[in-house]
Amino acid sequence: MTEQRRSPHHPATRPPAPPGTSRRVRLPASALRPLVLAMAGLTVSAHAQYGATSAIPNIDLVEPVVTQTPEAPPPPAEGGDLVPRLTEPATRTAPSGNTLNLSPSSTPSNPNAPAYVSGDRVTGYSEKGVEMEGHAELRRDGGVIKGDRLTYDQDTDEAHATGNVRLSKSGTLAVGPEARMRVQANEGYMLSPDYYFQQTGGSGSAERVDFLDPDRSTLKKATYTTCSPDNADWYFSARKLDLDSDRQVGTAYGGVLNFFGVPIAGAPAFSFPLNGERRSGVLPPLFGYGSNSGADLTVPYYFNLAPNRDLTIYPRILTSRGVQLGEDFRYVGDGYSGRIRGEFLPDDKKAGRNRWAYSIQHYQSIIPGMTAYVNVSKVSDDKYPDDLTRSVSQSTLRQYTQEGGVIYAWQDWVFMARVQKFQTLLPSEPSYEREPQLNAKYNRYDFHGFDISLETDYTRFRIPLTSTGFQQPEGNRAFIQPTISYPIIHPGWYVTPKFIFNAAQYNMDAGTNTTGASNTLNRAIPTVSLDSGMTFERDAPGVSKLFGVKYTQTLEPRLFYVYTPFYDQSQFPLFDTVQSDFGYGQIFTENPFTGNDRIADNNKLTLGLTTRLIESETGVERFRGTIAQRVDFTGQRVQLNGTLPDAKPSYSDLLAATTIQLFRGYYLDAGIQWNPDQDKVNYSNVALAYRPESRKLINFGYRYRRPTSVTDNTAIDQIEMSGQWPITQRTYGIGRVAFDKSANQLVDALAGFEYAADCWVGRFVYQRFRNTSNGYTGRVFFQVEFRGLSKIGSNPLDMLRLNVPGYEPVTARPVPTTPYDHYE
């Protein structure tokens, strides 16, 4: 038996009036904007955009960036923009948002437009009056009035229609038993109208609508929904609506959002914009559950301070911890922009102390090409990310940046001066801070065939004591590194010789450098390299015959040689240098270290070979296979920590990788790092995906890394599975699990489902992940998305996109319509 749900369209089944004791929750402005169409002849100018104000922004404290200047702060992680992004002009006042963005029709009315009438029987009752019966119809200036009986007086421009009356204009249709209108003046009324908006799919009903003038109208006991008339799962109702298109504002009295007949949100009175402009008010609530904080409810309030400034306040109730207050202030102007965010939780019930976090970003244009910036973030204690942040990425942050600087770009030069400090949370050890760093870079490409670059840098490095009270080396470092190369590129082959010269000087603080080492250290090391490659192509008839598509196969050998003389750097500090991960990218570089404190000695030749299968007609790559190995003719003596005295000629691990997309819906990426001397696999990874169509996917991944040295002693043996798959026609399951075999423990997992009705989507997700305190954190996400209205609940979409590769959110499935539906 098919379930019959309440419809807001038929008078006999019109939703009841709002309960007298409605919850004081403000609905987004977009809830009522479609109603304007039926009253004031407005037209839809944009489609609905979901989720812009459905959730609060996180603090999003910025991770440290040691090699470049941070970019502008990102938009809120769990919602859309409340104001224009900071890189946009300050004159933009209508942000993308969760609105239908309705605006008056761009076509002005024509007071001299002729009127056309028709009917089964047409009778003139005066010189300019006419009466029609049976399929009566009046058309004027793009508007249509129909009814069983219709009278029209051309002198007064007044039309009176009774019996199955239909008013239509600009894609809006209203149906009722009676209407009286002064057509051109847009004054009159309609009784018991049911209305439909073609471009948005929204519809509703009212007891009466009064058109006061071209700009103002009033509805009594009005409803609105984007559901189909026979299954109105949700609808918005209001005791009274006052709409003023001249002021672009509407006021709702007794507004209630009903879901399956149950009032879930309401407000005694509130105003809303009619044209997408921002207005101050309460935003949809965000709620969820976390194992560290209990039930979590946030009700944001938005202040529209100015066209280029806004402030959002986030009162947050955590049942296990107390009441937290957050704020997010944004501003953008001519040559400057910024964002200030903060959170404060007084007297945390669990921790027994005040908890807080803040983040400040500011960007200021000084002169053309010169920008100053500040990027500062800090938290109150080491446990703050685990206890009070809202995402896995934030909960695992162990370092927060306090940085300020100036960048100047002039022709081929970029100059930078900055001070960079960090707040490092236990159990992580502190990082080196730059107090200050002065850097200049020059890049010139194709200067008479040469590519030229130059980098020079002076940095004062300081570091806090370690957790055990140990003082690491501190001092000043200055280096200069010119580079010149001459690429020779021809069809089918290329050769690129390159010369690099690195000169550096260290002035160490007394008593902090390696025991017995000088406080002044110098080095000057040249490097030469030669990179070369060729590309051969041929038809692949065997593969083409097998798959029924013409393929081209390539064969691409590559040789890379690098030579750097040995220079003992065992007494040099490690300020910003680490060992690069060995892989296909690193094996074709001049230095296996990242940073400027170690320059490896090289006498190495890398040999690589790649083959591809490419669809000849489309150019799509369906297969790639790569193999590479490096030959070290003398052995590398310079190590990250010290010098290897007995280095010998050797072969590197053999690298092999493949990417396969030959079969529709199947994707494979695999790689392996094999040590031929020990006959052992040092690293391997496999990623297999099956995606036959949209919102159908299964991912499998495996990663393995064997500890190979004292500095690389972290073992990885991890399996990951994730997917999204339809369970029924409207229900989709989502899941992920990651298990660490080496530690025999769960890394993270999530499970949930999405349900897509014709006018709403429901999402429920539970996530559990290992935190930095060697424990687990669990979170519950529950969200309902009302098509064309708003979202209520906690937003899991960003988390799902991050954890389930290829995930696509399900969307509501409205009943299909055609341009001729409701055509008049």
Curated annotation (Swiss-Prot):
Region of interest called Disordered, as start-end residue ranges on this chain? 1-26, 67-117
The family assignment reads: Belongs to the LptD family.
Subunit (UniProt): Component of the lipopolysaccharide transport and assembly complex. Interacts with LptE and LptA.
Q: Read off the HAMAP family from this record.
A: LPS_assembly_LptD
Enumerate the UniProt keywords alphabetically: Cell outer membrane, Membrane, Signal
Q: Which domain of life is it from?
A: Bacteria
Which residues lie in Low complexity bias regions?
A: 98-115
Name the encoding gene, please: lptD
Question: What are the GO BP annotations of this UniProt entry?
Answer: Gram-negative-bacterium-type cell outer membrane assembly; lipopolysaccharide transport
Q: Name one Pfam family in it.
A: LptD
Q: What does this protein do?
A: Together with LptE, is involved in the assembly of lipopolysaccharide (LPS) at the surface of the outer membrane.
Q: Does the keyword ATP-binding apply?
A: no
User: In the record, which residues are listed under signal peptide?
Assistant: 1-48
Q: What is this protein called?
A: LPS-assembly protein LptD
User: What is one cellular component GO term in this UniProt entry?
Assistant: cell outer membrane
- The organism named in the record is Cupriavidus metallidurans (strain ATCC 43123 / DSM 2839 / NBRC 102507 / CH34) (Ralstonia metallidurans)
According to its UniProt record, where is this protein located?
Cell outer membrane
Instruction: Name the InterPro entries for this protein.
Output: LipoPS_assembly_LptD, LptD, LptD_C
